[in-house]
A protein has these predicted regions:
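Glycine-rich, mobile lid/loop segments that gate access to catalytic sites or pores
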Residues: 1
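Conserved active-site segment immediately N-terminal to the catalytic lysine
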Residues: 4-16
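Short, solvent-exposed loop/turn segments at the edges of secondary structure
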Residues: 6-8, 21-23, 127, 176
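Conserved hydrophobic/aromatic beta-strand scaffold that supports enzyme active sites
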Residues: 10, 25-29, 131-133
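Active-site C-terminal subdomain of aminotransferase-like
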Residues: 16-110, 123
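Flexible, glycine/charged-enriched surface loops at secondary-structure junctions
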Residues: 92-99, 109, 116-123, 168-173, ...
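Conserved C-terminal alpha-helix-loop-beta "cap" of PLP-dependent enzymes
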Residues: 112-197
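Structural signal for terminal/edge beta-strands and the immediately following C-terminal loop/tail
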Residues: 187-219
Length: 219
């Protein structure tokens, strides 16, 4: 995602997301203004060593020159370097952004045509182009009790996994019942485009099975 760097003083990100790496490691970026703040601010309370950026009257620059707070996994670091090398090979940040944009266009075009799904976010300004979150909007589904809705999604996920189409696309734990697809730059946009019709198929298959059995919806 393009970042409004002129508005940002401190940015953190994990290797896990855009680089498809380990979730327990990440990067801290400080703007010149943030560095000035670190140099001049004296905390009113004790700060744990692992969180200290200030040392001997100024910014602890060793943290930004390769010094480690704790012993990292070198395999994780090599994996991140490998991901950066791949990103450079395909065209750098511009290519990564294009992959995300293309996947998002595929996603939104499909949502606009699907009779069963809507994006989770109600405000278009809050729709994430990378965490592609869906809810099922079909009238039959929304008329079912919560436990049935959860069962429908669980059955859909099992079908998709059995067909080697998708794994681990359940909604976030605290989000409404639905699906969550990662549309970051490490995912081929054509894979996103190929996945989406399968979601309609999985829902229609599970709904038909339930309607033909003990559950009967309105549609």
């Amino acid at each position: 995602i393009e970042m409004p760097w002129h508005k940002l003083d401190v940015v953190t990100f994990s290797f896990q997301k855009g680089l498809g790496g380990e979730g327990g490691h990440g990067v801290l970026i400080l703007s010149p203004r943030a560095v000035e703040r670190v140099n001049s601010h004296v905390p009113a309370w004790p700060v744990p060593k692992i969180f200290k950026l200030h040392k001997k009257g100024g910014l602890d620059t060793a943290l930004f020159e390769g010094a480690t707070i704790n012993t990292p996994s070198l395999l994780v670091i090599e994996d991140a370097i490998d991901a950066l090398s791949w990103a450079e090979e395909i065209g750098g940040i511009e290519a990564l952004l294009k992959r995300v944009d293309t996947s998002f266009v595929h996603f939104m075009d499909w949502v606009g045509a699907s009779p069963h799904f809507e994006v989770l976010a109600r405000d278009p300004a809050t729709i994430s182009p990378t965490a592609l979150c869906l809810v099922i909007s079909d009238d039959w589904f929304t008329a079912q009790p919560d436990e049935v809705q959860a069962g429908v999604v669980k059955s859909m996920l099992a079908l998709l996994e059995a067909e080697d189409v998708a794994v681990d696309i359940n909604a976030y734990r605290d989000a409404p019942t639905g699906l969550r697809i990662w549309g970051g730059p490490t995912v081929d946009p054509e894979d996103i485009a190929s996945l989406l019709p399968w979601l309609d198929w999985a829902y229609e298959t599970v709904r038909a099975d339930l309607q033909d059995g003990s559950l009967h919806g309105d549609g």
